[in-house]
Amino acid sequence: MPNSNVRIPPTVPSKIIDVVDQALRARLLGGSTFNSGFDSLDSVLNLQFRLHYHVIGSNGPAKPVCDVLLKESQNLEKNMSMMEELNDYPEITKLVEKILFNCLAILFFHRGQFQESQRCLLHSLKIHNNTASQRTALMEQYDRYLIVENLYYRGLVSQDINIMQNVFYKELLAHVDTVPPESNGLLFEYISLIVAKLRFNQIQDLAENFKTTVENPFILFLYMIKKFQSPLKKHIDNDDLYLKFGQNVLLKVKFPTASETNDEALEHFNVFLQYYFKFTHIKKIKVNPSWYNFIISSMEKTFQSIEVSKTAMFLFQNLSDNSNDEIKKKTFKRESILNFVNFVKYNDKYYQLHDNSHHDIISFIDAYSFILQNSSKTDSIENVFDYDNTVSTFATSLNSFYKEYNLPLMSQSESLDWLENSTRCVYPGNISKVLTNAWSTLYEIRKCQLDFLVSNNLTSYLCNAMMLSTKEKDNADVEEQEEGEEEKALRELQFKYSYTLAQQRHIETAIKTLESLILSKNPNYYKAWHLLALCRSVQEDKEMSYKIVCSVLEAMNESLQNNTLLLNDRWQFIHLKLTQLALIEEIFGTLEALETLPEVFELYATLFPDSQPKLNSMGPKYSQTKEYLLQMVWIFAANMYMRTKDNDEDAKAAIKEASNVESKFKNLNCNIANGYLSIIKDEPGVALKEFETVLYYDENNLDALVGFAELIFPEELGVEETNLERYYTLSLDKKPGKRAKLTFVNDTDRSAAYARLKFLLECAILESIEAYYSPEVWWYLSLIYEKYQDDEYKNSLLKCIKYQELNPIRSLRYCNY
């Protein structure tokens, strides 16, 4: 007869299970806000988060932090027996206790109290969960992470590399033998930390040490983690070996029946392949074309597999990148996109069938980033894949994800002042990388779209990416520290943020950000110095800007002598020299600047010698070739000649030199320069033709728009209008000494010209960043509105004045290389 005194744990209500699962799911991601329904669980999860904040991506908490957290942990331990809310939930009780003792062990370890740490680790390890009826899949995942975390610190606390490795090799596969979901970030983190401590060269070594077969996808996954951790290490080509393993898996697989699921071994192998193909994509490594047959067979032997579709997306993009056949290239890219579409469709179906629970939200975000980075509007497929809609869906999904998991998100208004509003968010490494990549992807796609700049979306994207960085140099010994990949990525984000602020004409904030975030820690980051000089050039006194430029030019020359100047820095060197000329012209006059002009051509010849073909181009576009850069120098010279008296022929010769640099490609900047030269020579018909040619190809081209406006406005200027025009001033690159004007047949012809100019300018300020912030555009709009007796002319004139006062000596784009 059963003992009636034995207390049977009640069944946990589904609502409690849901909120506990959501809290654990958020914590596995690295979240910090929890509402599990149990104060004790929330408290210990919060304690764990605060501890990880000082542990993940760093050398551990400082002693004062350790002391505070240890005291809180010990108080929680004392109060465990008094937590009545846990009386009916032994599974939650054991979970709280296990988390707490892991935290205590970590704190004792970082305090150097290794015996105490060992005691806590062993105590945590003895906490077994026997109430299987109360356990959920999320609890199982969380428990697995806690065991692996415990294993990692048991290895460390031994303080012996051989003992540590033996512990890892002996126990890891007993606790985890499949690749975890990417959303299980904490488990991912500790697996990565363990792999970083293992010493091996070949996959075979790794398999032997773990006493398993080399075909094990989890072993292959661990090997790939090591590859990602050692980016500079020589790559060992195992492609054919992996393909053989995959083909062996396929031989044992058949299509599932209605009552069966997809083959686990094949699914697991495809998860490994996602990391492998991502690695080959990043490293631009060509894979065996036979992978195509493997992935097609995988599709044929699975039903709506999320994992196979994502693997196919990566593979087909790799095949596209490495194909020399344009038709095959496009076909493979299309296949990659179609598999992404399937991936999203299968994920949506999973979400609907599993009570609005994602299969793997981080994997989902990662796939979106990948496909958007590797496609464009031209790759849209009618009724299947619309690029712009996909970008919008991605942005919405990313914001929804942050809201669902209560993750800190910087708003548009807050993002205008990073120094005041920034928060450091610490997540597991794989989570941080995926989310940083996601925000960066949105920025790169939308960085040229005016509406996202004006609405502060761009600064918001960059701030949310910057918050995720866990690696940054200390101020001390800056020059002696070698910069890692994460630090380089953060520095680039900080530059883009400063650049975006400068684009918005938040000049003072941009200056503070450059000086505080970048230049104090990266004194040799030349493009940041160039941006700072351009921002300082807004000030009436140009001396500060000039000093910055001269100082940086000296530093770059030293780097050139030491042969440490990178290709993009060579482009920066030329443009910095041109900025110096612009400042000399502003401070000392055009003739003084012209005397310095030959130095630019000498510098170009030194930086880009014909004997070094690797310096010929920064990328596949013509605008990335050294010939295009030389054309820019000649155009700069031509514009400078136009601003002096009686130098029309020199300007004409410079434009001709620019045109002769490269005959295969027509540079529209030559047309623009010819247009302005024609204005000076009083040839309005020729000028109009040149500007119309440019506007045909680029309807928002600022220089062509302003040139076109000059031909129409004003026909006659009164004294007051002349003074106003002198105030707003055309940019230094375009200031003709004479005025050519179009001759209109009649009033209808004149009105049509006004109407067209109005249309072009109004379209430009809605679509073009350069046009929107151009004082010239707002000046001509104010003249048009005044002609039409439109009150908007007052607002346009105010914007003209505002943006003239904030106008740098040269366009900001010249520092962004």
Curated annotation (Swiss-Prot):
One GO BP: endocytosis
Where the protein is mainly located, per its record? cytoplasm
| Localisation per UniProt entry | Cytoplasmic granule; Cell membrane
In terms of CDD domains, this protein maps to:
YPP1 (cd23270)
Q: Name one GO cellular component term.
A: plasma membrane
Family matches, as InterPro entries? Endocytosis_PI4K-reg_protein (IPR051722), TPR-like_helical_dom_sf (IPR011990)
Q: Give the UniProt keywords, A-Z.
A: Cell membrane, Endocytosis, Membrane
Q: How does it sit in the membrane?
A: Peripheral membrane protein
Report the PANTHER family cross-referenced here. TETRATRICOPEPTIDE REPEAT DOMAIN 7, ISOFORM A, TETRATRICOPEPTIDE REPEAT PROTEIN, TPR
Q: What does this protein do?
A: Involved in endocytosis.
Subunit (UniProt): Interacts with STT4 and ribosomes.
Q: What does the sequence similarity comment in the record state about its family?
A: Belongs to the YPP1 family.
- Please report the name of this protein according to its UniProt entry: Cargo-transport protein YPP1
Organism field? Saccharomyces cerevisiae (strain YJM789)
